[in-house]
Amino acid sequence: MKDKIIKKATDMFLKLGFKSVTMDDIACEMCISKKTIYKYFSNKERLIEEGTEVVHQKIHALMDEVISQNHNAIAENFQMREMFKEMFQSFDQSPAYQLKKHYPEIYQKMMENEIEDCSQMFRQNIEKGITQGLYRQETD
């Protein structure tokens, strides 16, 4: 039930905005009581935190999928950049803006995680490219 609540709430947050979706809205949409939601989440902020973690995991899984295709480093880099471009073109900026404005701590944590993962992935890509002889050794 907890995973179902996270999935539905996250879908609603991304579609309608973090601030505008209430616990009542989520309960009504799922045909459950608010008490059921509060059984798993102490407050809306906790639900948002877990929802953003699920989104982070999905993005990480997409990155892992690209890496697992064993392209050379340059092709992998281009495919990864194309994936991010598509992801952010279809990404509605309103929920991200609301998250930043109304839940800045959650937004900051989410951005730190994404930046760290992307930086690590690009560092690994550079190392792979150097090993494959596609990138120069002295690349910073």
Language-model features: locations:
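Helix-turn-helix
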Residues: 4, 8, 12-46, 50
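Alpha-helical structural elements of signaling/regulatory helical domains
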Residues: 18, 68-72, 135
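Residue-level recognition of oxygen-bearing side chains
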Residues: 43-46, 72, 140
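Hydrophobic alpha-helical connector segments
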Residues: 50, 54, 61-91
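Short secondary-structure transition hinges
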Residues: 85, 89-123, 131-138
